């Protein structure tokens, strides 16, 4: 199994979206690349942690490739806007692909170059190493499964 992290705005919808992709084995939501250990949701929202609301994705590369996951991801984000997705505004809502395997960095860089042709503005989605990841509070895990009519910037219909 391979691992990758995605920051795609509010992590509730991003998690549900990746859960629907064949080959994704497991997801969780948390706070990534924080300058504070074990931040709370309130601390992340305050901007003092510089953390990203992120989704951990464990996937079977025999069923879905990283390229395919990035293609799917770009269908539900605006990669040309920094620190905002939909109505969610703040540094925690910036977009990014955060790798564990250093070999993935080059693949992501190349994929971003290819995808840039589809956008008139520069892609500002981050391509960085996952430095740390703190699991978000339990009520955030699988939020839209527990609250099917909850707020989401991603349209599933």
Curated annotation (Swiss-Prot):
Catalytic activity: L-methionyl-[protein] + [thioredoxin]-disulfide + H2O = L-methionyl-(S)-S-oxide-[protein] + [thioredoxin]-dithiol; [thioredoxin]-disulfide + L-methionine + H2O = L-methionine (S)-S-oxide + [thioredoxin]-dithiol
Disruption of the gene: reported phenotype: Non-essential, it can be deleted.
Pfam family, one: PMSR
Root EC class: oxidoreductase
Molecular function as annotated in GO: L-methionine-(S)-S-oxide reductase activity; peptide-methionine (S)-S-oxide reductase activity
Record-listed E.C. numbers: 1.8.4.11
Catalytic residues identified in the record: 10
Keywords: Oxidoreductase
Signal sequence range: none
Its job: Has an important function as a repair enzyme for proteins that have been inactivated by oxidation. Catalyzes the reversible oxidation-reduction of methionine sulfoxide in proteins to methionine.
Family: Belongs to the MsrA Met sulfoxide reductase family.
Protein name: Peptide methionine sulfoxide reductase MsrA
